[in-house]
Amino acid sequence: MKKILSISFLIFLISLSNLFSSDFEPGIGFVLPLGASISQKSQIHNANADKNNGTLSGKSAFEFGFSITPGMYKGFDDYMGFSIALDLGYHRDVYSYKENKLGGSQYKEVSTKYSFDTINIGLLPKFNIARFFIGIGGGIKLLVSGSEKTQNYNEEKSQFFDSETAYNFNAIKNKFKNPFVPYIKATFDYLFFFDNEIALGIGLYAGYDFGPQIKDERFSKNNLGSFDIGGQISFYFVND
């Protein structure tokens, strides 16, 4: 059985090598996504913790970014084609919530927002059928810097006050379990060809960020997340 699997894997590698050695051309895409993030959460309180304090409910927020997709393209201007490219870029990720906080003897629902400057590194294979360009991929986002906006309770004044904390990379590593998050995404573009090497794409994207886990002694699990959806404009240059 192991021999069969080894031979099958070897045949797959040879076939893949032959595929990329024939009719594939280098190319690059420049993509500008604009959209919304719909925040998610996964929380489990510790046994002795107050089950109401710190509970999150998701809100939506605006997000944006910029990415480049250098890769290899086959049949870019044909009726059917395929490409495999890196997904490299910058993204402003926002996780926005309503948070239940204890102030004195009462709870108050406050707005809490985590914003991050991220560098994404991933892989984005795409199929083109006629003028439609469809991609499914994923990778990781490195949290370079960020901030937290919320309201905290002042015991002396017996009231909540606005609070904003900035995070550099070291502070992110202290606040969260990992400074990177996995992501998956799908893209759908309609291409307008200027010639057989250059095209403008207008389309949609959707994805999910498996957000960072907050270090908090009240929780055994306190994970952020977001469903992302929006529109994008792209330019593709392929050496056909």
What do these predicted regions represent?
Residues F20-G81, S234-D240:
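Short glycine/proline- and aromatic-enriched beta-strand/turn motifs that initiate or cap beta-hairpins
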Residues S22-F30, D78-I84, I119, A130-I134, ...:
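Outer-envelope beta-barrel architecture signal
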Residues F30-A36, F64-K74, L88-Y90, I121-I129, ...:
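Residues on the lipid-exposed face of transmembrane beta-strands in outer-membrane beta-barrel proteins
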Residues S6-S8, I28:
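Short helix-onset patch at the extreme N-terminus, typifying the N->h transition
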Residues A36-E63, G89-N120, L142-V181, K185, ...:
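Extracellular/periplasm-exposed beta-strand and loop segments of Gram-negative cell-envelope proteins
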